[in-house]
């Protein structure tokens, strides 16, 4: 358990990372480093998007599965790593 | 029915019909019922006229029919007065009726056909007689026909049919139909209802995608397998345990924090974040191929990629490096200390190239790690050898340290799991070679050629051996203690050697037997000594560990990974080996020489090419100048004098330089001739100001480079300072000597010369400090140089 905590801390303190959050299977955020309203917004929207992406990948080949999702925008990059029950979202500003 | 109905009506008319009651009451006047009308005699004698009509008293008098024509109900005037009192259906029909006639006709036909049949079957004599009475009455015919009919019954039946058919077409109903209908008793209907409480409801919605179906099937399969397993291991104890375990697991699940399940995702995210941060390095790793290698004449470079370091291992030197045989991006770093006086703890870190900021696995131990290796078949097993002589095995699958301690007799040196090395001699299990003068640091077999191996030692040399021959085939002197050597996995002629001065040398015997095709400092500070080097099995990268605990990953440029050209019919792998054998044989003819070539060989190209200089480099050269001055020196070197000086400078990086310079009084021209080995021919042209002189040097390649020599003199006579800065027409600075004009670099030279003057002879001994500054980005050679 401490390992995961450490990993999350490392991620949060990594260069360029704006925020991290852990969202459960229903789209409810469990842990976050951002403020409430932003978190809720991100959680809701990204949860849906991840489900859609996962459904797409698996529809094409049911033995395949989504590993991660990256959305690169002008301002920053949103990275989503889905798990069986949880969703880990990290927003980073790639240093460029 | 109708008769019965009529009868009933007559009987009932007593009470029903209004007129009837009155008549009956009056005819029975003698008997006085109690409700009889009390009438006077006059009224009694009144005569009432009654008329008998043939009307049916029971017939309705006011039948109303709906007239569709007029659209109203209309009274019908004419009413049927017929009253049927009795009727019965009989079975006699009148002769003249249709039915009677038909029957009669039919009977006649029957008789006639019988006769004709008789004619056919019996003797033809009777034909005329039979035909005669045929037309007679049916009765007479029938009588005579009877015996005939009986005789020829069967035939007549057939005959009967055929004459009947054309005459009689209409078949009437022979049966007496009567329609009967009856209505069953209709049971009264009853509605019975019952209402219960509605069952609890929930809304359920789902999608049926391809993958949902697949998942359902997979679940089913798993369930089946589980049940199979349960059946196999069925004991009451096991059941109990199972239940307990189940309970425990459920308990734990509800208790444990949700965070532990995010482990996998967190790992992935960490790698992604690192990928973003080190994006350019990752891209370089994958795609960058140094294009300048084409111009570099077979030499290559090492491109620094990631740097791996961990705070916990900061003080510890890297003592071992090993790539994982299965996962080509995972490597193990063993930390310990080479200082035999100071021994502290050790660490084993496993890094993945996908995450350069934090190791994947960390293990710490009490004693320093000296060597490590990974199991080929079970890539999760790592064996390490400690300084205190213990050997431990770590299982990466389990999170805890699992040692299998075995103390060994050797008290920790570089214990390669295969080889044992001793201090003074390199010894095989079969043989002993007199190899090195000092400690042998590493020995390694060639991965392709089974006879060849090499060894490196702190005596600055790397030697390549053929194990059947006692003397080494090749010896390389690297000017510094060699920490480690490694063969490249992709070619049998390429190997790398790392030295304690922070340089990595890469040799390719098929390209250049005597020299490195790349030597490059790879660690930032000169204090860092590189301790180990390893090639990655598939990627063109090497990892280099130093004594500060840092591991640097470098990419080999294309020139360093040249594959030998495939010859027809020969496998590529064996090719280089064959080549080596050839070289071997060649050298054996000349085996007395140790084949160590000085780096300053005339044919060799300039060594400074192909090396990435550190941002600055200094060299000190000793310069002895003898000057003959026409006028004894009073103020340094005056341009108005004729002076002849010969200088010889020696420096570790420079060629011996002999320079002859003559200054002629007009001070416009000075000629200096340098001996060819310095590759430089300088022509001095002394200029106006007394302490400034301009010199033009002519390089061997016939390019003119002006360089500015600034002379200054200090108060102390015997000492004069001269500095030189040269300017290259390409805009960058270069120095004519001692490096030659091969590189345009910023060079500053400060030299301190002590002059001993005796009359007109002046002897100067000077130390020059040449400072060479690397201008980053200016790797391409100067057009003038």
Curated annotation (Swiss-Prot), chain A:
Q: Which GO terms describe its biological process?
A: microtubule-based movement
The record ties this protein, via InterPro entries, to: DYNLRB1/2 (IPR016561), Roadblock/LAMTOR2_dom (IPR004942)
User: Among its keywords, does the record have Nucleotidyltransferase?
Assistant: no
* Entry-linked Pfam families: Robl_LC7 (PF03259)
Report the coiled-coil segments: none
UniProt keyword annotation of DNA-binding present = no
Q: Name one GO cellular component term.
A: cytoplasm
- Functional note: Acts as one of several non-catalytic accessory components of the cytoplasmic dynein 1 complex that are thought to be involved in linking dynein to cargos and to adapter proteins that regulate dynein function. Cytoplasmic dynein 1 acts as a motor for the intracellular retrograde motility of vesicles and organelles along microtubules.
Subunit structure comment from the entry: Homodimer. The cytoplasmic dynein 1 complex consists of two catalytic heavy chains (HCs) and a number of non-catalytic subunits presented by intermediate chains (ICs), light intermediate chains (LICs) and light chains (LCs); the composition seems to vary in respect to the IC, LIC and LC composition. The heavy chain homodimer serves as a scaffold for the probable homodimeric assembly of the respective non-catalytic subunits. The ICs and LICs bind directly to the HC dimer and the LCs assemble on the IC dimer. Interacts with DYNC1I1 and DYNC1I2. Self-associates. Interacts with DYNLRB1.
* Name of protein: Dynein light chain roadblock-type 2
Organism of provenance: Bos taurus (Bovine)
């Amino acid at each position: 358990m401490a390992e995961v905590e450490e990993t999350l801390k490392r991620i949060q303190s990594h260069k360029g990372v704006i925020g991290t959050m852990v969202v459960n299977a229903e789209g409810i955020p469990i842990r976050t480093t951002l403020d409430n309203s932003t978190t809720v917004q991100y959680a809701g929207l990204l949860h849906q998007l991840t489900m859609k992406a996962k459904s797409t990948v698996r529809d094409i080949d049911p033995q395949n599965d989504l590993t991660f999702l990256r959305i690169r925008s002008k301002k920053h990059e949103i990275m989503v790593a889905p798990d069986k029950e949880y969703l880990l979202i990290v927003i980073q500003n790639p240093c460029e | 029915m109708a008769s019965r109905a009529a009868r009933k009506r007559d009987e009932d008319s007593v009470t029903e019909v209004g007129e009837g009651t009155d008549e009956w009451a009056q005819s029975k006047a003698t008997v006085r019922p109690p409700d009889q009308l009390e009438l006077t005699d006059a009224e009694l004698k009144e005569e009432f006229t009654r008329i008998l009509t043939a009307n049916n008293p029971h017939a309705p008098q006011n039948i109303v029919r709906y007239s569709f024509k007029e659209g109203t109900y209309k009274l019908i005037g004419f009413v049927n007065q017929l009253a049927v009192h009795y009727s019965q259906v009989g079975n006699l029909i009148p002769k003249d009726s249709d039915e009677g006639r038909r029957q009669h006709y039919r009977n006649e036909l029957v008789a006639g056909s019988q006769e004709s049949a008789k004619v056919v079957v019996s003797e033809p004599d009777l034909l005329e007689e039979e035909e005669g009475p045929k037309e007679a009455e049916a009765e007479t015919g029938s009588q005579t026909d009877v015996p005939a009919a009986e005789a020829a019954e069967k035939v007549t039946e057939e005959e009967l049919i055929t004459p009947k058919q054309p005459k009689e077409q209409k078949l009437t109903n022979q049966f007496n139909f009567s329609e009967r209908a009856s209505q069953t008793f209709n049971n009264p209907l009853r509605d019975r209802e019952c209402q219960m409480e509605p069952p609890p409801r929930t809304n359920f919605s789902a999608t049926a995608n391809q993958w949902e179906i697949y998942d359902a099937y997979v679940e089913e399969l798993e369930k089946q397998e589980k049940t199979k397993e349960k059946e196999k291991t069925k004991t009451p104890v096991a059941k109990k345990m199972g239940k307990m375990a189940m309970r425990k697991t459920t308990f734990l699940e509800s208790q444990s924090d949700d965070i532990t399940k995010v482990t996998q995702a967190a790992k992935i995210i960490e790698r992604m974040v690192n990928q973003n941060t080190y994006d350019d390095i990752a891209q370089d790793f994958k795609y960058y191929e140094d294009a300048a290698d084409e111009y570099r004449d077979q030499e290559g470079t090492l491109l620094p990629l990631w740097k791996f370091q961990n705070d916990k291992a900061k003080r510890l030197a890297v003592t071992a490096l090993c790539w994982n045989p299965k996962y080509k991006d995972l490597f193990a770093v063993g930390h310990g200390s080479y200082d035999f006086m100071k021994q502290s703890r050790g660490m084993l870190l496993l890094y993945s190239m996908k995450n350069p900021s934090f190791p994947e696995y960390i293990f710490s131990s009490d004693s320093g790690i000296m060597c490590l290796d990974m199991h080929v078949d079970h890539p999760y097993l790592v064996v390490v050898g400690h300084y205190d002589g213990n050997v431990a095995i770590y299982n990466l699958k389990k999170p805890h340290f699992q040692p299998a301690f075995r103390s060994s007799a050797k008290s920790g040196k570089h214990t390669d799991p295969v080889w044992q090395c001793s201090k003074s001699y390199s010894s095989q299990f079969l043989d002993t070679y007199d190899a090195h003068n000092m400690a042998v640091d590493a020995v390694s077999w060639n991965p392709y050629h089974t006879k060849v191996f090499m060894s490196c030692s702190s005596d600055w040399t790397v030697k390549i051996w053929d194990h059947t021959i006692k003397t080494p085939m090749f010896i390389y002197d690297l000017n510094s203690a060699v920490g480690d050597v490694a063969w490249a996995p992709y070619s049998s002629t390429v190997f790398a050697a790392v030295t304690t001065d922070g340089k990595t040398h890469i040799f390719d015997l098929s390209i250049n037997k005597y020299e490195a095709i790349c030597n490059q400092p790879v660690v930032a500070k000169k204090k860092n000594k590189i301790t180990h080097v390893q090639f990655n099995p598939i990627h063109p990268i090497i990892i280099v560990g130093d004594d500060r605990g840092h591991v640097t990953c470098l990419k080999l440029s294309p020139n360093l990974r040249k594959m030998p050209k495939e010859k027809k019919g020969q496998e590529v792998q064996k090719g280089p080996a064959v080549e080596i054998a050839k070289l071997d044989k060649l050298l054996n003819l000349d085996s007395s020489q140790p084949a160590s070539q000085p780096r300053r060989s005339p044919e060799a190209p300039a060594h400074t090419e192909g090396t990435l200089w550190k941002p600055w480099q200094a060299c000190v050269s000793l310069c002895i100048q003898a000057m003959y001055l026409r006028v004894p020196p009073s103020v340094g070197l005056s341009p108005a004098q004729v002076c002849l000086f010969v200088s010889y400078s020696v420096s570790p990086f420079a060629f011996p330089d002999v320079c002859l310079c003559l200054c002629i009084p007009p001070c416009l021209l000075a000629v200096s001739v340098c001996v060819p080995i310095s590759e430089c021919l300088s022509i001095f042209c002394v200029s106006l100001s007394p302490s400034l002189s301009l010199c033009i040097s002519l390089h061997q390649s016939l390019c003119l480079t002006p360089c500015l020599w600034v002379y200054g003199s200090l108060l102390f006579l015997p000492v004069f300072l001269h500095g030189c800065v040269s300017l290259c027409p390409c805009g960058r600075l270069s120095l004519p000597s001692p490096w030659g004009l091969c590189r345009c670099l910023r060079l500053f030279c400060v030299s301190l010369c002590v002059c001993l003057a005796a009359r007109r002879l002046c002897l100067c001994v000077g130390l020059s400090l040449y400072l060479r500054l690397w201008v980053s980005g200016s790797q391409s050679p100067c057009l003038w140089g």
